[in-house]
């Protein structure tokens, strides 16, 4: 991803382009793990916001059909393509600095602002990529379980889980990575992105090979921590964790009413409570018709004849096993994948992340007394999409607390 700094022509010498450019880059790159390994594509400007990936399918090997007869030209084969579309989006944020503050510590404010904004936008890019990667259906569950809700605290990530994921990728003929970030050749490998908690559980295994044991022999990825069975592990603090979206209680409900008032409704709960979502109230499952976050109400698809007592548990079943209080276990998602399993898509120069600094006076009539300056960061265009679902395995598991 290219990093640029846009500087207003009226800016003073305090705005050092190279310095702030470097500051934004350093902080953003600390967050870019998932976004580092995708197949990168750019889109030309003025060609719309939707981008189409074309993935060629492998030819089917058939010894009989491929046997040549002397002097006979065989029929040609047709290329088969799978099309994947994705839409780019822009992201951005800024902070405002008063002229009074600028007279005492303006450079420090710009420096700190660029650092904080770089980390914020870098994290957003990481989340967008991570969530796209975790939308796949090629899932395996630790401990031999068959679904997320059945995972318990005992179902931690093990070496056997990694071996199974590698087998899945090999059987799917997933391509292996053969070079490092700077293009230098290294041994063919798959990549695993995992949380520090998942790393903690794996490192206790005697088969774990710490990065210090081979660091001198190969060029490493940023954040690389070790390897197992041809898998290189890269750690991310933003690795996916599936937490229970709704966990609250009933505040009030009347008999024969389809609307329930909840004791609380978080932003996460509001995002989950869309039409058609499944919700447990006590032991009964209900379907959501609508939700009103401001009033903490949920309208169900059907009225409930008996009044639901206040204090009754209200919860979703989108995390791990429930405890006696209906609280779901946090489930971690560890990704093991091959090259070209997913793509990151941005505009002509790669969805540049850039700082935009506007000094006092640049706003004209909108700032008649020249009291305000701003420093912002903007992702010009970015998105991510899975290109081959069979080449990316999501292992869902518990972790040691």
Regions found by a protein language model. Give the residues of each.
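Autoprocessing Asn-cyclization modules and mimics
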Residues: 153-160, 208, 236, 240-312, ...
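N-terminal "assembly arms/tails" that initiate or stabilize quaternary assembly
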Residues: 1-86, 389-394, 398
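Long, compositionally biased low-complexity segments
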Residues: 222-245, 319-339, 343, 354-357, ...
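Extended, solvent-exposed, turn-rich assembly/linker loops in the middle of proteins
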Residues: 139-225
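Long, contiguous amphipathic alpha-helices that act as assembly "spine/axial" helices in icosahedral shell
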Residues: 53, 80-148, 183-198, 367-379
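Short helix/loop capping segments that flank catalytic or ligand/cofactor-binding pockets
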Residues: 61-64, 105, 201-204, 211, ...
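Cys-His-centered catalytic/binding microenvironment captured across papain-like cysteine peptidases
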Residues: 283-285, 299-341, 347-350
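Extended, compositionally biased alpha-helical segments that mediate assembly or anchoring
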Residues: 2-8, 325, 340-341, 347-401
């Amino acid at each position: 991803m290219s990093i640029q700094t846009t500087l207003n022509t009226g800016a003073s010498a305090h705005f050092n382009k190279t310095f702030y450019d470097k500051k934004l880059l350093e902080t953003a790159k600390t967050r870019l793990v998932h976004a580092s390994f995708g197949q990168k594509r750019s889109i030309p400007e003025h060609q719309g916001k939707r981008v189409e990936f074309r993935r060629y399918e492998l030819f089917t090997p058939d010894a009989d059909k491929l046997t040549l007869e002397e002097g006979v030209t065989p029929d040609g084969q047709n290329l088969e393509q799978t099309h994947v579309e994705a839409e780019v989006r822009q992201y951005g944020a800024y902070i405002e600095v008063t002229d009074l503050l600028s007279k005492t510590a303006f450079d420090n404010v710009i420096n700190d602002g660029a650092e904080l904004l770089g980390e914020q936008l870098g994290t957003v890019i990481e989340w967008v990529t991570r969530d796209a990667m975790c939308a796949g259906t090629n899932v395996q569950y630790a401990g031999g379980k068959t679904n997320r809700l059945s995972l318990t605290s005992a179902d931690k990530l093990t070496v056997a889980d990694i071996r199974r994921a590698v087998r899945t990728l090999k059987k799917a003929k997933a391509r292996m990575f053969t070079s490092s970030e700077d293009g230098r050749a290294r041994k063919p490998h798959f990549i695993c992105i995992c949380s520090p908690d998942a790393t903690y559980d794996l490192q206790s295994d005697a088969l774990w090979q710490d990065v210090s044991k081979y660091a001198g022999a190969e060029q490493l990825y940023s954040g690389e921590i070790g390897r197992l069975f041809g898998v290189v592990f890269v750690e991310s603090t933003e690795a996916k964790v599936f937490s229970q979206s709704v966990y609250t209680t009933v505040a009030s409900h009347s008999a024969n009413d389809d609307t329930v008032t909840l004791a609380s409704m978080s932003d996460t709960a509001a995002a989950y409570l869309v039409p058609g979502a499944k919700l447990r109230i006590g032991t009964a499952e209900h379907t959501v018709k609508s939700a009103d976050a401001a009033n903490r109400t949920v309208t169900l698809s059907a009225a409930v004849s008996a009044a639901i007592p206040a204090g009754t548990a209200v919860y979703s079943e989108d995390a791990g096993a429930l405890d006696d209080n209906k609280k779901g276990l946090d489930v971690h998602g560890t990704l093991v994948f091959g090259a070209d399993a997913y793509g990151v898509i941005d505009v002509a120069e790669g969805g540049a992340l850039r700082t935009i600094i506007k000094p006092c006076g640049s706003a004209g009539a909108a700032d008649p007394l020249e009291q305000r300056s701003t420093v912002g960061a903007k992702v010009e265009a970015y998105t991510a999409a899975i290109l081959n679902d069979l080449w990316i395995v999501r292992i869902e598991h518990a972790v040691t607390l």
